[in-house]
């Protein structure tokens, strides 16, 4: 038997002071000696994906208590990337991932909690908690707040926007064809309920990946935040984590720990899922970071290999009119994993917090398996309510029938894949010797080869300016540098530049490359995570206006057509300059907190984690 971590504060004479304090929190005499389960919540009124989580912790706590554990809740911070987008607030988004991970470690280790239920949802909160879980390696179950419903259709100047979401609103704001009244109509429809934004953006991508990693329950990534069916996920999470405690502490079963579940094979399965569902490019950052925290030998080269073999089986907003509610109707993540499994594209030697093997997991939960349980079938009938609300569990609507069309439906089989390559591709070349990433699911294949002159800017703000003032021309490659983890600092998302290119009619006529990153809502020929970044001496810092940049997605190449000799001449000049590898004319306030992150941050190919050794 493995002693409970909390025993040092709950058992023996030396723990009298700690027990006195535990009693002051409401702990009962008969609870001392039981596993203390940290309910790691992230409720906030700042973020629609978290606004409904205030009372959810109580649901989990009740389930933990009934199962024999002692629940204790605390909260982490949560940044809304959409509200922080396009101004200095975005500098804080990626660094907040590290703050969240650290805060979870601080609370859990300071109070010797035995296990965790992580109630996350939005962009950096799930990754931050995932990093903490892999770092701490104690029993954990993830249960997110769930996706937002898609907005209802609106018609603006005869053009249908159906259904709507956050990206619809941002793109419409940059379109000359949309007047103020039309923009107001789109805005009012775009985000109708609580939950993580309704497309396959970063938040939903990461919540889906926790299913594939084996750390959350089936349906976690796709069951709507507003649906009553989601209550059972919270209850089951509380029950399950106590069972994991029993197996680890009582039976010394280390296979139930995060590092026993999220093995290299599980990480490979998660990235195979990511490729198949056309997930956000941010997932690569976060998966690489989580692997490092868990000491899993999984890097960008592994992702590159997977992307060559795994087809894209689903295109969801911003790459189609499908949204998470449609993914759910098609069977959610178990259906996607089922198609990958039938295609021989998954490692079978994996398990999860809820199942001892992959085959049993998919038999029970994949609606196309022919063996699906009634519970699973009922779950995937959960449909949107269509009513504006910030309340969880506010609808019990059901789809009349499920989407099982493997040829033309939301989730396709391997035979009917959108593309043979995965929805995410790693590009290398003299601009990105350590790698860059493109969401190939977001662009038509005829755009996979693009060559044009560079238009160089040194901040996201400058990029927005050249787009909105119509300075950039069709056929050009917009190069946005010094926006990497160190150079930004904070590796801003380029959602506004990509949305404004789309709204200006240049979404298919220009390319954008950056050492920054992209929102999960970005689309078009957008290449991010260029490594090394400019601030670390990357070639992206040497590109000049007019240099010819070539992009070849098929052959995974990203090159600037400048000789090695000329690049070396430019490098020598840069090194001899007064402020080498820094933006020349950028006016940006960088606080001490951000400077601290910048000094420790690695480039994107390492997950933009902090290097502290």
From Swiss-Prot:
Enzyme class label: lyase
Cofactor: [2Fe-2S] cluster; Mg(2+)
GO molecular function: 2 iron, 2 sulfur cluster binding; dihydroxy-acid dehydratase activity; magnesium ion binding
Pfam families found in the cross-reference section: ILV_EDD_C, ILVD_EDD_N
Pathway: Amino-acid biosynthesis; L-isoleucine biosynthesis; L-isoleucine from 2-oxobutanoate: step 3/4; Amino-acid biosynthesis; L-valine biosynthesis; L-valine from pyruvate: step 3/4
Catalytic activity: (2R)-2,3-dihydroxy-3-methylbutanoate = 3-methyl-2-oxobutanoate + H2O; (2R,3R)-2,3-dihydroxy-3-methylpentanoate = (S)-3-methyl-2-oxopentanoate + H2O
Residues given in the record as [2Fe-2S] cluster binding sites: 122, 197
Protein's UniProt name: Dihydroxy-acid dehydratase
Species of provenance: Corynebacterium glutamicum (strain ATCC 13032 / DSM 20300 / JCM 1318 / BCRC 11384 / CCUG 27702 / LMG 3730 / NBRC 12168 / NCIMB 10025 / NRRL B-2784 / 534)
Taxonomic path: Bacteria, Bacillati, Actinomycetota, Actinomycetes, Mycobacteriales
Gene: ilvD
